[in-house]
Amino acid sequence: MALLQIAEPGQSAAPHEHRLAVGIDLGTTNSLVAAVRSGEALTLADSEGRHSLPSVVHYGVDSTLVGHDAEALSALFPAQTLVSVKRFMGKSLSDIQAGMQEFPYEFSVSEQGLPLFVMPQGAVNPIQASADILRPLIERAEKTLGGQLQGVVITVPAYFDDAQRQGTKDAAELLGVKVLRLLNEPTAAAIAYGLDSKQEGVIAVYDLGGGTFDISVLRLSGGVFEVLATGGNSALGGDDFDHLLQQHLQAAWGLTSASAQLSRQLLIEARRVKEALTDNDTVTAHVSLDGSDLSLEISKADFEALIATLVKKTISSCRRTLRDAGISTDEVIETVMVGGSTRVPLVRQQVEQFFNKTPLTSIDPDRVVAIGAAIQADILVGNKPDSDLLLLDVIPLSLGIETMGGLVEKVIPRNTTIPVARAQEFTTFKDGQTAMAFHVVQGERELVDDCRSLARFTLTDIPALAAGAAHIRVTFQVDADGLLSVTAMEKSTGVNTSIQVKPSFGLSDLEIATMLKDSMKHAKDDISLRMLTEQKVEAMRVIESLQAALNNDGDLLELSERESLQAALANLGEIAKGNDRDAIEQAIKALDDKTQDFASLRMDNSIKAALKGQSIDNI
């Protein structure tokens, strides 16, 4: 597997080979597939030049139709034609029971309690239906790119839970396709605009699709996108604009009742008029009915009056979501527009007015999510130019933590495949220590000063025990996106704290290569220095431990014995200031030999204290 081959930074194991990977926007209404070709991310068209594929599946007795062909049959065979399958992903039958009457389908239930659609070919679950939508997109990509895909990145709404995400992944794996990553749709849109590597701050992603509206508030910091809040309306989208215009035409022409065929004809014309009004002040609607031609001039003002209430609802959702995130509009540095319905001028005007800044619209809003997914897929599969964002499926440099003496304890070694989790236990250095500071570093050198600092945090409320008695478990976890979470937990109380950081942020291939070369160049000196430092730390521990023992139980010794130990302590302290490792080691051993009798006296004294007042029968 190419991603797991170890090569020097900036070099693939087979530099001449371009690996094929795509990004897929698996949408509620439409789906798209995109790829990076000649350095540019583009959506891929079908044989008829169409980029979007309607997310519709028709199940006939002997055949399954997907996309445009299925959509054409949706009015005639609604019970056999699945639309908006994404709404059912990861849901149990009980989850959708309240709204089942809204759907024309016959439902049954699986052994796991999941909804099944009863079709002429048999029962179909949402995962299988999603796989049927993905299939023509995968086939289109492999035909266009001329080879088998090595992986895909599929986008999902930011609010999808684990079950919905797993269902999406399972749909691709039913087709034998490797899912490199599931990517949040708003994050994909931000990546398409290059916001992941250029800025830090709060980004709002306004996504008005055909059937749903989503608003996501993201914080970008250190190359990491954090979803602060999401909101929206799952029953509001561009289709509602079409229906309002359809009803307006129907009323204007006096069509009090309309057949399914006429309703569809009116809806298609309403959609055409809506799209034409984006660039025109007036458009004439035309419909042929029983040999008669009906026409009506629609102005942009007419259309905006029809949809104004719906647009205001989306702005209200934006206001609520910002409030949930604890963010003001002044803190939003960019607004990204996603979804074909954001082309409507009134929508753009209202969004600009609310956020008080011009939204990003230069990338086709229908395609921006797929394009961002394609950029991510190209990086993950290994086609990364030196100038691109560093995102590897192995850890390029070791991750570790600072220990006493400024030494580095490596927790996750370089070239470990991700995702990964590793843990180590540490303990307190001094008696009564109730807090511990952690310094997370990255690099191959033995000393902290020679490594890259990533983060610092402190664990407090550690029980006040003797040095070495408290046990703190430190867990390093790197997820599939390269995001490092470090958690420190005191085992007896469960008190814990954590921090997140992206080790790859701001780190170029050249810097990685330099750090690796330095580690090899200085390896011998670093090891010697580490061994010396470890002896100095041990000397410090012995000195502090013995000094505390003398303070507590020094009266157990004769004066001459106490003076002898104090002299040995001073001697070790003086030798530890130097750089002779062997001399420090010998001084520690000499002091250890001198304290044997004192240790026995302390042990006897502790036993006597414990047994004082106890009868033989109780022992």
UniProtKB/Swiss-Prot annotation:
Belongs to the heat shock protein 70 family. HAMAP family: HscA. PROSITE patterns: HSP70_1, HSP70_2. Keywords: ATP-binding, Chaperone, Nucleotide-binding. Pfam families: HSP70 (PF00012). Chaperone involved in the maturation of iron-sulfur cluster-containing proteins. Has a low intrinsic ATPase activity which is markedly stimulated by HscB. One of its GO terms (biological process) is iron-sulfur cluster assembly. The keyword Zinc-finger does not apply. This is Chaperone protein HscA homolog. GO terms for molecular function: ATP binding; ATP hydrolysis activity; ATP-dependent protein folding chaperone; unfolded protein binding.
